[in-house]
Curated annotation (Swiss-Prot):
Gynoecium. It is found in: Nucleus. GO terms for cellular component: nucleus. It comes from Arabidopsis thaliana (Mouse-ear cress). Homodimer. Interacts with SPT. InterPro entries: bHLH_dom (IPR011598), HLH_DNA-bd_sf (IPR036638), IND-like (IPR045843). Induction: Negatively regulated by ARF3/ETT in the abaxial gynoecium. The keyword Flavoprotein does not apply. Pfam families: HLH. Keywords: Developmental protein, DNA-binding, Nucleus, Transcription, Transcription regulation. Residues 125-174 form the bHLH domain. This is Transcription factor HEC2. GO terms for biological process: carpel formation; gynoecium development; ovary septum development; regulation of DNA-templated transcription; response to temperature stimulus; transmitting tissue development.
Amino acid sequence: MDNSDILMNMMMQQMEKLPEHFSNSNPNPNPHNIMMLSESNTHPFFFNPTHSHLPFDQTMPHHQPGLNFRYAPSPSSSLPEKRGGCSDNANMAAMREMIFRIAVMQPIHIDPESVKPPKRKNVRISKDPQSVAARHRRERISERIRILQRLVPGGTKMDTASMLDEAIHYVKFLKKQVQSLEEHAVVNGGGMTAVAGGALAGTVGGGYGGKGCGIMRSDHHQMLGNAQILR
């Protein structure tokens, strides 16, 4: 399975995770905002197509009409017959960005039980201070890796090295989105510092990012919260 197939599988997995309830009752939805309904609260999520680098103009098929983002077609159906390395890389980058845009529309919820280390049976544990300290250090690293796997789109389906590489791309994507939000706030004359401070405090204060995230009052909050967790 090549990289394009892996990215396509990741995109399909992310789409399956999208909640079923989108605000598609409005016949003329605002293309700059997508409203998503989670369990009991409505969370607005920011999507700015003007900053997208996707070269595709086809609307996503087989999905809810309320979604307003561009779809990166399958490499086998849209790329020219003579595909060079540059076109393949551009298509993979576009597909990766599509996956990330789907991922940022999802609320972050990590079950603390899912990141606990597996229980070891019939294993003698050394009580030597150095061994204990080394074991605790390894456990902390493993716990952070498991958390990161659940934050990175498709991270639970990858090996650690691939997941870390994908995390780098995800952080770069989130940084670009934060810059877009800051530019958007400057153009509108808004105070981005105050908005960002409140969003990051609310997100980080929610522990693993579960129910403590609360209700995001603007479409800036979710993107900034995702970026802060990955920093």
